[in-house]
């Protein structure tokens, strides 16, 4: 609800997914913890440390604490785990990932940003695809037409493994 120069969000209706912060172009709506600035500062530190040690840009994988963590754990037990240059970042909900975090991760030094999302969360995923398209359009001129950002929507660890093997 717009109230003068502020935006009021009814906490009784809030699902806690972070969609409001992901799609808000002004930053007026944001989740309380972790805030966008906290996440971006964290990503900057991780990326700069990785680059200093490995002498190459890392890739980033956002995932949620329930769905994503379980698939990644399974991948580690059954397959070879995640690629060595792919840094997993667990967040409460992948609905929180918007153009701010995607482009911010690129500015922080990540060469690609992937989002592992749950196929059963249609509303979150629809918004995520819109945000990925926006972010790819924003960086299109510097990417030579290559997409920096991609969602992987699956419950299948084998499909995730196959997608990760395609990374350059």
Annotate each language-model stretch with its function:
Residues 1-38:
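Iron-sulfur cluster-binding cysteine motifs and their immediate structural context
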Residues 17, 52-54, 81:
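Generic structural signal for beta-strand residues in well-ordered domains
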Residues 25-26, 46-48, 78:
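General N-terminal targeting signals
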Residues 56-168:
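Non-ligating segments of multi-cofactor redox enzymes
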